Amino acid sequence: MARGAEGGRGDAGWGLRGALAAVALLSALNAAGTVFALCQWRGLSSALRALEAQRGREQREDSALRSFLAELSRAPRGASAPPQDPASSARNKRSHSGEPAPHIRAESHDMLMMMTYSMVPIRVMVDLCNSTKGICLTGPSGPPGPPGAGGLPGHNGLDGQPGPQGPKGEKGANGKRGKMGIPGAAGNPGERGEKGDHGELGLQGNEGPPGQKGEKGDKGDVSNDVLLAGAKGDQGPPGPPGPPGPPGPPGPPGSRRAKGPRQPSMFNGQCPGETCAIPNDDTLVGKADEKASEHHSPQAESMITSIGNPVQVLKVTETFGTWIRESANKSDDRIWVTEHFSGIMVKEFKDQPSLLNGSYTFIHLPYYFHGCGHVVYNNSLYYHKGGSNTLVRFEFGQETSQTLKLENALYFDRKYLFANSKTYFNLAVDEKGLWIIYASSVDGSSILVAQLDERTFSVVQHVNTTYPKSKAGNAFIARGILYVTDTKDMRVTFAFDLLGGKQINANFDLRTSQSVLAMLAYNMRDQHLYSWEDGHLMLYPVQFLSTTLNQ
């Protein structure tokens, strides 16, 4: 235990000795730093005193020089020099050339004193020369020095007086549109405009429930149907001979005359009406034309029996429009296209390849067209002038036009002839001539047809079909017969003989598509129906009862 205590006291003593040694070392370093600082302070103090002494000497020299120069500047310019004794002048080496002028001598003494007794600082000399005049001699002006560096821009000066008004400048560009001003007084109400056109047909809705059974209709007129002449039946048995009559008295002999013309048979089987009456008189049976009874009537041969499968020619983006070919001249391959149901421009294509390639020229019409019922006949375009009851004939070659007003025709308030094609007037050309299909403004319900004279551009006759336009989707004319489709343009449900003025039984399919049928027209040059179906340009072959037209 005692040995452990002694070891602990030894360790504490060594620590105390280390601490005292560190304190002694720090004290020695502090004393050395203090001595070094005192030595530096003494050196700096002596250097400062030397600088102050030198500065004082320079100031005294500057003040002495300034006072001397001031004395020289105050001395009179014209004062004579002090007299000199002969010895002095003999000792003066500068007097060998004679006494100089007083002002030259004064200047020489000044220069001598300056060179002998003082070294003048340049700054002091410059200040002296600038403050006193006549002390410093100036030589000739030296060449101008180089231009100095550009100085800083000065402060903005005050605005000057406004100058005179200059000449008027050019018109500047249009500025921005200003704010809307105060609304003016209300003007007089304008005339009431026409109602806008219907929008495009929407999608077909869901099929509704069946309606109630309607009442039985009136019995139809059988005489309106075209009846085909039947085949000749077998000859009946001869009747019993009658009793012989009494002989008559002989007549006087007649004179011989020329043979008269042969009279045609009255009952030859080719009658102008809708039906042919076959007489029961046996005396006329043998004289009738047996071959004629085996043929159909000309009117029946002109009827359409069916429509063939369509061929698509082109697909365009416009829903409404027409594409037309010349009906009369088969050598003219041009095709004309009008886009939309209203416009003033017509596209003319050289032929069908140009139509497919999109190569065309524009033709500007004299009036806006309306509808999709235009035709081209003998190098002239016939169309409806928009917003009026007027037809226009525009000749392509001469670019001249004629107009024809159709009295009592419906052409406004969106009361279209055919709502599916936005059309008021539908023109048509067939083997019988030029026609126009329209609705009357008197009743506004029935479909009317007018035949036009191409030469005089006038109306020849009007035909009232009495068929309501509300049941019609579209229509066309072929070989003098009007054909009307249903409201969906899928079947032909009505036909009317325009030359005979009678209704004809007709009911056949037209197409299977339910797209918008904007145009439907018959062309007699190729016996096809031309249609515009929701942008599809289609051709339908037509099948007649007879392939040739009997006049």
Curated annotation (Swiss-Prot):
Q: How does it sit in the membrane?
A: Single-pass type II membrane protein
Q: Name one GO biological process term.
A: signal transduction
GO-annotated cellular components: axon; cell surface; collagen trimer; extracellular space; plasma membrane
Where is composition skewed (Pro residues) in this entry? 237-253
Q: In which tissues is it expressed?
A: Specifically expressed in spinal cord, brain, placenta and sciatic nerve. More abundant in peripheral than central nervous system.
Q: Which residues are glycosylated?
A: N130, N329, N357, N378, N464
Which portions of the sequence form the region Disordered? 72-107, 139-282
Q: How does it assemble?
A: Homotrimer (via collagen-like domains). Interacts with NRCAM and NFASC/neurofascin. Interaction with glial NRCAM enhances interaction with axonal NFASC. Interacts with MYOC.
Q: What protein name does the entry list?
A: Gliomedin
Q: Which organism is it from?
A: Homo sapiens (Human)
Taxonomic path: Eukaryota, Metazoa, Chordata, Craniata, Vertebrata
